[in-house]
Structure formats: C-alpha cells, structure tokens
Curated annotation (Swiss-Prot):
This is Putative 3-methyladenine DNA glycosylase. The keyword Cytoplasm does not apply. Belongs to the DNA glycosylase MPG family. It comes from the Bacteria. It comes from Deinococcus radiodurans (strain ATCC 13939 / DSM 20539 / JCM 16871 / CCUG 27074 / LMG 4051 / NBRC 15346 / NCIMB 9279 / VKM B-1422 / R1). GO terms for biological process: base-excision repair. Its EC number is 3.2.2.-. PANTHER family: DNA-3-METHYLADENINE GLYCOSYLASE. InterPro entries: Formyl_transferase-like_C_sf (IPR011034), MPG (IPR003180), MPG_sf (IPR036995). GO terms for molecular function: alkylbase DNA N-glycosylase activity; DNA binding. Keywords: DNA damage, DNA repair, Hydrolase.
C-alpha cells in the first residue's frame, strides 16, 4: 500500500517512437495484493495470468479488463502477484499528441481512467510489459514534494465485486482528472 500512496503526484513520462514526450501527473491509483486480495484474479483463473502478474518489482505489466489494457507496476518480490494500477493522469506535456492517439470531445476524458490513459499515451502492451519502470520509453519520476495526508483521499476500490471495501484506492483530493468511477465510501487510510 505504501508504494500506491507514494506514486501519487509523481510524473509518468512516455517518449514515443517518433520522439514526442508525453507526460502526466499520477492522480489516482489502486493497489492489488495477491493472494490475500479477494479481487485479485491472477491465479484464480489460469496459470499464464498468474505468471504474468508475478514479475519482479519495479517492472511494468498490463492487465486486460473487458478487452482494454490497464497499466500496472509490479511491487512485491518476484513470484508474488501484487501491483499498483495507475487509474488516472493529469496531462502535463504532449496533450495534442495524446489527442491524436485518443480523440475525445471533452479534454477531461483524455486520461481520466486506466484504459483511457493507456490509449492516450499510445502504449503497446507488447512493447512495454515486463520492462523496468525507469525505461527510456516509459518511466516514472517521483513527486518533487510528497503529498500531505490532507491532499490525499482514500476510498474503496471501484469496478470490482470482491474486496472493493479495502482502503486501497488513493487519489489526489479535488483533482479534476480523477476517474469518474464512484466508490461506495471514503475510508480511513491503511
């Protein structure tokens, strides 16, 4: 859970194959911690998915939900399926190029959801998955200043049935780029 909280306010930077720099501030994340997490499906359905999720910490991985790719950071020792899902970004650089990848009529819809941000950054899961989070083409920069507790909201997770009431969704309070998904409740930090 600590990594999920620490990613908030950081910058996700994408350098496209044609040299464009796209970046966004991480404004929403969710943690998943198998095997104790009832929402974690890695291993419940088939071994290939479990192996995909159980990579070394500090590497990118993609999970597909309803056919859409979701960007995650592996965060436990190799062999254990645990990750942080990046749910939303506030665009900082390259919004025009992001719109080329993901045309939208409302700018807020560009990166305010986990699949939306993958499409807006033009990410190819086959090219990025299992690469270190400090790869030149996609990397994370730590926040210049860690967020204060009063700047962070902790809620129940969204878009899942089991384990949704765990306090593992973190977002920057009042940020307009947070996904529109509504949790069932705001919770105390873990």
């Amino acid at each position: 859970m600590r990594l999920a909280r620490e990613l908030l306010g950081g910058t996700l930077v994408r350098v496209t194959p044609d040299g464009h720099r796209l970046s966004g501030r991480v404004v929403e994340v969710e943690a998943y911690d198998c095997p104790r997490d009832p929402a974690c499906t890695a291993g419940r359905f088939h071994a290939a998915r479990s192996a995909e999720m159980a990579i070394a910490p500090g590497h990118w991985l993609f999970w597909f939900a309803h056919g859409h790719p979701l960007l995650q950071v592996a965060c436990r020792q190799e062999g254990v399926s645990a990750s942080v899902l990046i749910r939303a970004l506030e665009p900082l650089e390259g919004a025009g190029k992001m719109l080329d990848y993901r045309p939208v009529t409302r700018q807020r819809d560009l990166t305010s959801g986990p699949a939306k941000l993958v499409y807006a950054l033009g990410l190819d899961p086959m090219q990025i998955s299992h690469r270190p989070v400090n790869s030149p083409e996609l990397h994370l920069l730590a926040p210049e200043t860690p967020l204060a507790d009063d700047e962070v909201t902790v809620t129940a997770r969204v878009g899942i049935r089991e384990g949704r009431n765990l306090p593992w969704r973190f977002l920057i309070r009042g940020n307009g780029w947070v996904s529109p998904a509504q949790p069932s409740m705001e919770l105390a930090a873990p």
